[in-house]
């Protein structure tokens, strides 16, 4: 899943961290390990990268709805510092679907401690619109 050069899970992008995502029935799961290049406060992941991981993860998790879309809002709560160089576990669920709006929740866990959580609103776009966007990208 994803694009080859995506900065978060693109296999050909040198800044992409080890990141895997899979869907099991109605729950999305992920694993990521962020190294020193993602450091914010000492020995912890920069909050911007935490948000980016959530955006990518929930963007794929919304495939559960059958109507994937683009990010409308992403509200992140930081519970504890997210450590570097530790396997992070991600869990994502669909909270609600209202017409074209997909609302999902996500959590990041490190060593059995939840470090961050979020809620994302994604707006479904048609396959035709998606292809138009892709074509404009070149």
Per-segment meaning from a language model:
Residues 1-31:
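Non-catalytic linker/capping segments at the edges of enzyme domains
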Residues 18-20, 91-94, 119:
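Short, surface-exposed charged micro-motifs
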Residues 22-27, 45-68:
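Active-site helix/loop of acyl-thioester processing domains in fatty-acid/polyketide metabolism
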Residues 34-48:
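Short histidine-centered catalytic/ligand-binding loop motif
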Residues 56-89:
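Hydrophobic beta-strand-centered segment that forms part of the acyl-chain substrate-binding groove
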Residues 82-84, 95-138:
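HotDog/MaoC-like acyl-thioester-processing domains
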């Amino acid at each position: 899943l994803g694009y080859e050069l995506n900065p978060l899970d693109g296999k050909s992008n040198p800044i992409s961290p080890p990141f895997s995502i899979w869907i099991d029935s109605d729950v999305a799961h992920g694993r990521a390990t962020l190294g020193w290049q993602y450091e914010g406060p000492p020995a912890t992941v920069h909050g911007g990268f935490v948000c980016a991981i959530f955006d990518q993860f929930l963007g794929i998790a919304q495939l559960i709805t059958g109507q994937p879309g683009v990010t409308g809002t992403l509200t992140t709560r930081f519970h504890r510092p997210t450590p570097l160089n530790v396997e992070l576990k991600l869990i994502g669920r669909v909270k609600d679907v209202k017409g074209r709006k997909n609302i999902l929740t996500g959590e990041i866990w490190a060593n059995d401690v939840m470090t961050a959580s979020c809620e994302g609103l994604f707006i479904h776009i048609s396959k035709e619109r998606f292809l138009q966007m892709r074509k404009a990208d070149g």
